[in-house]
Amino acid sequence: MFTMKKPLLLLFFLGTINLSLCEEERNADEEEKRDGDDEMDAEVEKRFLPAVLKVAAHILPTAICAISRRC
């Protein structure tokens, strides 16, 4: 009976280690996905900001002239 317990304990121990490693890898993958979303948001902001500045550069002088009526 004792000889059966050793292999079973070994299998249980190895299975526990395997599950632990898989869980760590899964957590690392989830962190990479979250970091990737932040990078994508930053890229969208970088592309969006110059377009907004160009539009503002064209509209702002016209709006100032219309408000002050000095143009």
UniProtKB/Swiss-Prot annotation:
Q: Where is the signal peptide?
A: 1-22
Which cystines does this chain contain?
65-71
Where does this one sit in the cell?
A: Secreted
**Alphabetical UniProt keywords:** Amphibian defense peptide, Antibiotic, Antimicrobial, Cleavage on pair of basic residues, Cytolysis, Disulfide bond, Fungicide, Hemolysis, Secreted, Signal
* Tissues showing expression: Expressed by the skin glands.
Q: Name one Pfam family in it.
A: Antimicrobial_1
Which residues lie in the propeptide?
23-45
The UniProt entry, under InterPro entries, shows: Antimicrobial_frog_1 (IPR012520), Frog_antimicrobial_propeptide (IPR004275)
Biological process, per Gene Ontology: defense response to fungus; defense response to Gram-negative bacterium; defense response to Gram-positive bacterium; hemolysis in another organism
Q: Which GO terms describe its cellular component?
A: extracellular region
Role of this protein: Antimicrobial peptide. Active against some Gram-negative and a variety of Gram-positive bacterial strains. Active against fungus C.glabrata 090902 but not against C.albicans ATCC 10231. Shows hemolytic activity against human erythrocytes.
The entry sums up its family as follows: Belongs to the frog skin active peptide (FSAP) family. Brevinin subfamily.
Listed name of the protein: Brevinin-1SN1
Upper classification of the organism = Eukaryota, Metazoa, Chordata, Craniata, Vertebrata
